Amino acid sequence: MQQIRAIVGTQWGDEGKGKIVDFLAKEADVVVRAQGGNNAGHTVEAFGKVFKLHLIPSGILYKDKLNIIGNGVVIDPESLIQEIESLEKEGISTENLKISDRAHLVMPYHKILDEEQERLRGEESLGTTKRGIGPAYTDKTERTNLRVCDMLDEEEFVQKLRTVYERKNQILTHVYHKTPMKFGELLEQFMKYGEILKPYITDTIKLLNDSIKAGKKVLLEGAQATMLDLDYGTYPYVTSSHPTVGGFCIGAGIAPKYIQEVIGVVKAYTTRVGKGPFPTELLDEIGNSIREKGREYGTTTGRPRRCGWLDLVVVRYAVLINGIDKIALTKLDTLSGLPKIKVCVGYKYEGKVLDLFPASLRVARECEPVYEEFEGWSEEEIKAAKEYEALPKSAKRYIEFIEKETGAKVFLIGTGPAREDIIIKD
């Protein structure tokens, strides 16, 4: 493998990045999570078990890999500690986990504010996970948030908490009519978190760059995806960070010149959670069938995902923004059994055909997808195939069409949920 690889989601998240990272982590020495919080969820099936990871990189399932939670991640210590304990209970060591001392904290008031802000938006709600991620990033931008390193310095923590404590309580009590938080309880709680997490906390920027200089192979693991990026996604129905390659450099603390290969994870169909435009959405039995067969329910929230045909306008856009070199195609098996399969290649709007995703949500809502149709394949044919040439002709046509339309080669194909259900192409 190239020394530094970045794994990015090309759609609205839930593409199966966790499985791809888990597969590629075999060849890596270091796996890094660079942005987002516990609003994300990666599901990996290994050792006959299902692991649902929210903050910890998927490389943790390998004993000899260094796993880093970078400075761009916002961390809810309670959630992280629960995740660590859950892994340890299953016999998975977390000794090789390191947490950036520069990462920002999700505080209890962030979670309350997230929930109350969503409630007040009513029908205009954004569909957040209510985990406090947006408010934490807001405080980071306002330069009023607390960081992981502050949990290791009580004096510093007290000083920083005092500057925001009264204001947050005023908002909670006067605007949202909530019970005020108690300073002493917050302080005690986070000092306890700091003690538990202290062995994991370090300067990960130095650690990562020293690893690169030593020739270690690094995998940058994205959470969420391109269409949820704060700048490039379907704003305002986006996340509060940058799940694109540029965001990985900032959130991990490495220079862009080090990234040698960008891998885009593409689900063989499209899904999204929550509100926002979705041109290829299927509001029929086919959509329901894909949801049930693909187990399309949120790892973090359990919410049913909206399902639709593969949208190459979206994927093309992600390839352009991220400079994607190769594609890992996932969940090809979920489409098995459908007599006909459609792929969107453009959007028809006011007499024109758009080949890249528009900025305007009105255009995205009102456009008409332009489809190409393909013959389907059976589940037996997909399950029996262990190499590319053994795939049914119709599936190979589907894959080769994706390559032609996006300009990126497909090199991995997911044919089932298990770790070993992957075909290597070329």
UniProtKB/Swiss-Prot annotation:
IMP binds at D14, E15, G16, K17, N39, A40, G41, H42, T129, R143, Q224, T239, R303. GO terms for molecular function: adenylosuccinate synthase activity; GTP binding; magnesium ion binding. Pfam families: Adenylsucc_synt (PF00709). It is an enzyme of class 6 (ligase). One of its GO terms (cellular component) is cytoplasm. Its cofactor is Mg(2+). Binds 1 Mg(2+) ion per subunit. GTP binds at residues 13-19, 41-43, 305, 331-333, 414-416. Plays an important role in the de novo pathway of purine nucleotide biosynthesis. Catalyzes the first committed step in the biosynthesis of AMP from IMP. PANTHER family: ADENYLOSUCCINATE SYNTHETASE (PTHR11846:SF0). This is Adenylosuccinate synthetase. It comes from Caldicellulosiruptor bescii (strain ATCC BAA-1888 / DSM 6725 / KCTC 15123 / Z-1320) (Anaerocellum thermophilum).
